[in-house]
Amino acid sequence: MGKAQKKKAMRRHNPMRVPDSHIPKGLESAASSTRKDKVEAVLPIIQKVRPGGMNSEDVAERTWACAAVSNLIQNDPATRRLLQGKNVVGTLITRLSDPSEEVAAEATGALRNLCIDGGFDICAEMFNKGIMGPLTEFIPKLSTTLQNVLSNPKSAPEKVQELVYEFAENIITILWCLSETSNKALNAINSISLIPFLMSFLINRAKLPRQVVHASVQCLYVLSEDNPPAIQTIRSESEYVACLVAISTAPQGPNDDEWDIGIRVLACGSLRNVSPLPAALNASSIDIDRSIALPFITPLLSYSLDGAVEEVKNTLANPPAPAPQNNSLKFAKLPKSDDKSPAEILLERIERRLRVLQLSLEILTGVCAQLPDPEPVPEELEDEDEDADMDREEGLEDEIIQSDADDAPMDEEPPSFLASPEADQNSIKLLTTLIPLLLSLSTPTSMSFPPSSATATITTEPTHLPTTSALTSVHISALECLSNLLLSFPTSDTGPVNPATAEVAVAAWPRAWTTLTASINAPSTTDRRMELSVAALGVLWGLARLARGVLAPQKEQVELLIQVADSTQADEQVQVKCVGILGSLAQNTREIEMNKAIAQYLLSYIHPTPRSAEPTLHALSLLIDIYADEANTYDVNFRSLKGTEVLASSITPLRKLVRSIDRRKEGGTELRRWAEEVEGNVRGFVTYRRKLKI
């Protein structure tokens, strides 16, 4: 059983700040925005979008229209979609070529906010409406301006420098959002040689505002993930690699905040993305995971979510008074905060810290997902050949199905599995260090879920949707990270488990189970509720595996796992996780009744009709593991359920199930190979059990 691999598909590095589903009546409101205040707020913008507005000869009018769009769309799907219907995206893109730099800057700001709040659909619309044209033209101009400003700071007034940095930050943010929209958009970005432009900000980070440096390293992190052109560009320049190493290993200063930590986390992630480093580089000898990533990220996991929630609640209940305006503060307009209250600034700081934490967990998940490549399958191996081999075995299989005879072919021993290497002390130490931290971050808080529709109007608890969205992301990332850690931990599928790791797993089980039940019982309006539940199941599977035969199965837990696996919402992966958990719980020799209930359920995956391929194969493998030793106290259950005969009668439908696996689909070759192995194990197991005559 392999550990979960880090998934890239449709996983945004800058997730929507607040999903539409979190906003009360967000989607419904977007479909029919008739509220008077909304109409009154949007009508002037619509007028400005039309000729005489953004297309006005008056620079101030065009600037105002772009700025107003930028302000109105934040966390408001109704206004955003209303403006979309008026082609605001296309109009803003035309404003990128405005002769006024101020108008162009405001347009990039509005497009940036649309990218972050609107998600993939708006990014795709921007790409399809030709945004790459003007963006591509900006890169060399900004590079030249940046070089001039850095070499001679007095060559441009401070206000001009602020505009340049703000403009660059917006452009870079749009590009990183576009890069995650489609392969077509990514290829277009690869073609403009963006990496040197981004690295120029990182190399000169000490002279630049942190926000633009942060945007640059964020974009670099996204582009360097599974993207060979970007990876090769970074690896080919020793200066780039040295810069990333320097940022990742920089000691934390006493005044460092979320921006500084975020920059280091992203640099660390980018460094991992381009590994292994070429041998010619000095940094090639560094073990990035053990020497940089783990020592840096582990302390970040101590952040208290409950403390953050309390700070948010206190800020909402007692917002701090505005501080005296300080117009001389350098780069105060980066990012725009002129009109934000102290409470808004504080809440954004907390949200930003949560996003940094989520990103750290994402990188740590990758550290825990280092699997060796599967053995290559010879290209000349074809389905027809495999099916022919299986046909030649049918006579033998039919004998197994129909015969109890003593001379039936059998192995001397039941099917066995290669034991995984024993865990060393360093691995156990890592496990005992990370499990409590990750469990703490995965446990829902009082603000982790939006209020249900039934309680939204009567609750007195303060709510802050951006915090709720960020907390959900942290919980899911922590669970996925913990799942990878647990499922990658060396252990065997048979025989005794390591007592030290079993003790850790048993202690962690109740809290992980609480997270699962909390996610299942969360309000139906909770965005990513199913994703949270699936991640929690992955953790429980890993814990059950480490404490196989030690964990005592509880009746209500077994019933809930069966209920989840059989629900209409459960896909194959959910069923696999539930089956895996149940299979480990069934191996407690003191819980005979629970063993029987689980065995009945596992047998239902093959009899009377096989279910989906992967969960069925897992169920069969687990049945063999559970009843491999006929001397176990619970073996009486297998006999009373006539397990041997059920498995014998299942060989023909199992053969058909194996043949139905399409090797041409992603993962199909590996699944087909494993299915054939399971089929062979079932045949051997049936023969072995019949030979026992018990």
Describe each model-derived feature in a short phrase.
Residues G2-K7, S483, L487, T491-R655, ...:
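Extended, charge-rich low-complexity regions and/or helical-solenoid scaffolds
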Residues T63-P77, T91, A105-F120, L163-N183, ...:
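Alpha-helical solenoid repeat architecture
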Residues A31-P44, P51-W64, A68, L72-G90, ...:
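Elongated alpha-helical scaffolds that mediate protein-protein interactions in large eukaryotic proteins
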Residues G119-D121, F127-L359, I363-E379:
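Fungal eukaryote-biased detector of long internal structured cores
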Residues L305-K313, A317, P342-L347, C368-A369, ...:
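Eukaryotic acidic, Ser/Thr-rich intrinsically disordered low-complexity regions
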Residues E57-D58, P99-S100, S143, V164, ...:
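Short inter-helical turns and helix N-cap capping residues of alpha-solenoid HEAT/ARM repeat scaffolds
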